[in-house]
Amino acid sequence: MLDLNNVSYSDDGPRDFELIPDGTVVRAFIKLSGGDHELPEFGGGTYFKSSQSGAKWMPIELTIVGGPYDKRKVWQNIFVDGAKTDQNGFSIAKRIGLETIKKMVDSHFALDMKDDSPEAAQKRGSINGVHMLNGMQICFKIGIEKGSNGYADKNKIKTILTPGSQEFIAGSPAAVAPAATPTPQAAPAPSAPATTATAGVTPTWAR
């Protein structure tokens, strides 16, 4: 029989963390969480789809490596499709999503965004699906997303950094995160406006 009266609380420090300050630069491992929708043009990987719009996204978990925020986590969504299109009829969400994914790959491989050398092309070309982001280590600047609908403020990716930025923190592209296989899990459909491809809520261009 369960007896909680004999269970002592361990003194592991506070359970609630203060938000990481806006503008903090960190490195973190990526862990993907798949959904139940496939997008062949993005290669391997599965996505969630909003029941209220054309938005599709993949949740990511970022575990910070090193520094005062070691092992802290940041959760966001990579939006990869939406109903709104540009003047050429191309999905705005898909374009921004592809740009975000490319920045993550460039950050992992320590490639300058303007590097179009054969070596850079070979490294980018080795990524044949979004699923390959799983376990990559990237550098990014922390931001703070204002909470809405009763949710508290939370940290988010403000900017993904590459060697072209003076704030870029170099790491080892050979570093491998602890083995983890993405598994589908429930995620609330985002509902409020945002401005980045990795925001926690549905951007207007992804609806």
Which residues make up each language-model segment?
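Short beta-rich binding modules
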Residues: 1-207
